[in-house]
Design a protein with these regions (language model features):
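Canonical Rossmann dinucleotide-binding motif of NAD(H)/NADP(H)-dependent dehydrogenases/reductases
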Residues: 10-43
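A glycine-rich helix->loop->beta "capping" turn
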Residues: 14, 62-65, 85-98, 104-105, ...
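A short, exposed helix-loop element centered on a Lys and neighboring polar residues
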Residues: 132-133, 176
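C-terminal helical subdomain
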Residues: 191, 212-303
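The beta1-alpha1 cofactor-binding region of Rossmann-like NAD(H)/NADP(H)-dependent oxidoreductases
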Residues: 49-50, 70-81, 114
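Substrate-binding pocket helix/loop in short-chain dehydrogenase/reductase
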Residues: 107-109, 113-118
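Catalytic loop of short-chain dehydrogenase/reductase
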Residues: 146-170, 175-184, 193-215, 247
């Protein structure tokens, strides 16, 4: 007789304090609710007091612990204040889940205004930098921290949203930089590329696409991956993880040997041997600038 397998050990966050930015609605709200349900003490940050307080109240009503915070991540002083809220309410900080952001499609690069660029970059990219920087001394001092940045597949290229793609691509670089900096001091940093039916998705002009998104991509299905990436036991740092509709997968950056002519390289070599430049033969995952530099320094007698 085959014995029934034991139920998997639940993932818990007891004793951990988490900041979730942009947590009043959409993806951030779902992340905050799941963290709260699994034992974390949650700072629910959102510039809308109504929505921040509602999410915090829902966590508390379900038996969890949460407080609302309404400071803007785009303001460095606001980021400092968010961290102070965590320390004041719960006396500690372990998790920084950066989710806040404003703006999306703006049209072509010619149609995108300075004001739109500023709004998008200041929240998605600079806001994530501000809050993580404010929290970093605490995480460093305790030799433990979990940081998540909310990037997007749009960073790989998307029509009609050059500023958004730029900001999200910046988060790729920030994730990798934080992973390198945090490795010796117990801090991990990863990026989530979520696909969920949120307010911005509801603005899609194509009705068929909109309905498909609404049916298959509820925001809460992005939260298991988001929360695992800020758990004590997360096995990675510097990764880009896409999730949506129940799928979770790695998005990798790779480097290839390419064309290497040494000092003899000419413009004509690049033209005539372009197939070697872009060949995927010998490809390997590149996680940092040092990994990419290793293609040049593989035979060096000094350490890169």
């Amino acid at each position: 007789v085959t014995e029934p397998s034991a139920a998997p050990r639940p993932v818990r966050f007891d004793g951990r304090v988490a900041i979730v930015t942009g947590a009043g609605r959409g993806l951030g709200r779902e992340h905050a609710l799941l963290l709260g349900a699994r034992g974390a003490q949650v700072v629910v940050n959102d510039v809308s007091a109504t929505h921040a307080e509602a999410t915090a109240a829902d966590i508390v009503a379900a038996g969890g612990q949460a407080v609302a915070d309404t400071h803007s991540v785009a303001d460095p002083d606001g980021a400092d204040a968010i961290v102070r809220t965590a320390l004041g309410a719960f006396g500690a900080l372990h998790i920084v889940l950066n989710n806040a952001g404003q703006g999306g499609p703006t049209g072509t690069i010619e149609q995108t205004t300075d004001a739109q660029v500023q709004m998008i970059v200041s929240t998605h990219l600079i806001g994530s930098f501000n809050v993580t920087r404010a929290a970093w001394p605490i995480l460093r001092e305790q030799s433990f921290g979990r940081v998540l940045l909310t990037a997007s597949g749009s960073a790989l290229g998307a029509a009609g949203m050059p500023a958004y793609s730029m900001a999200k691509a910046g988060l790729y670089g920030l994730t990798r930089a934080l992973a390198v900096e945090g490795a010796p001091i117990g801090i991990t940093a990863n990026a989530l590329l979520p696909i969920g039916y949120t307010r911005s998705a509801a603005l899609n002009p194509h009705e068929d696409t909109r309905r498909w998104m609404e049916e298959h991509f509820p925001p809460h299905l992005c939260s298991p991956a988001a929360c695992w990436l800020v758990h004590d036991d997360v096995p990675c740092s510097g990764e880009l993880i896409t999730t949506g509709a129940g799928r979770v997968a790695r998005v990798a950056t790779v480097g290839v040997p390419g064309l290497d002519r040494g000092p003899a390289l000419t413009l004509e070599d690049v033209r005539d041997r372009w197939s070697d430049v872009v060949s995927m033969e010998g490809a390997r995952v590149v996680m940092s600038g040092r990994d990419e530099l290793a293609f040049y320094t593989g035979e060096a007698t000094w350490r890169a």
